[in-house]
Regions:
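Positively charged n-region of N-terminal signal peptides that target proteins for export
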Residues: 1-4
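Bacterial N-terminal signal peptides
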Residues: 7-15
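Short, solvent-exposed loop/hinge segments that bridge or flank secondary-structure elements
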Residues: 22-51, 86-96
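Sec/Tat signal peptide C-region and signal peptidase I cleavage site
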Residues: 16-20
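Tryptophan-anchored aromatic micro-motifs
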Residues: 21-38, 57, 108, 131-137
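N-terminal glycine/threonine-rich, aromatic-flanked beta-hairpin/loop signature
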Residues: 35-76, 110-113
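Short hydrophobic/aromatic-rich beta-strand segments that constitute the beta-sheet cores
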Residues: 30, 48, 81-85, 105-110
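Edge beta-strand at a domain terminus
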Residues: 21, 64-80, 103, 109-137
Length: 137
């Protein structure tokens, strides 16, 4: 019984440590706009729904905004990730800084203005260039 509990404890500890070592991987949500962000900035392992013909990528952002925005370029610099998103028709790009605020909270900041839009009625309006994303468990 003691061995089983010890094994379980060690397994949980190693899982928690693994998550802490890869902070730029997971599913994140911005409650303010209803935007979902799915990222793995370490490896190209994700496929955007409806865009499987593009193959694996580092991530994408969808829901609460117009279309799907896919990561076309990224690099990590300590607790900050520099990301370039392109929209699903390839007409717009957006450079973003994603900074770790704490273990589960990330600050999204659009560089050079924001190209991401959402539909309001029959118009497309720009969303805020600053968003807060929280890790979804």
């Amino acid at each position: 019984m003691k061995k089983a509990l010890l094994t379980l404890f060690l397994a949980l500890t190693s899982c928690i440590c693994a998550m802490a070592q890869r902070p730029f991987e997971g599913h994140f949500f911005c409650k303010e706009l209803g935007v979902n962000l799915y990222i793995n900035l370490y490896e190209e392992t994700l496929t955007a729904p409806g865009f499987s013909f593009l193959g694996k990528m580092h991530g994408y952002m969808k829901d609460g905004i117009y279309g799907t925005w896919m990561i076309t370029k990224c690099h990590i610099d300590g607790s900050c990730a520099h990301i370039r998103f392109s929209n699903d028709i390839g007409s717009d790009t957006q450079d973003v800084e994603l900074k770790i605020k704490d273990d589960n909270t990330y600050d999204y900041h659009a560089i050079g203005g924001n190209a991401v839009r959402k539909a309001m009625g029959r118009k497309l309006v720009k969303v805020s260039g600053d968003m807060t994303f929280v890790r979804v468990k």
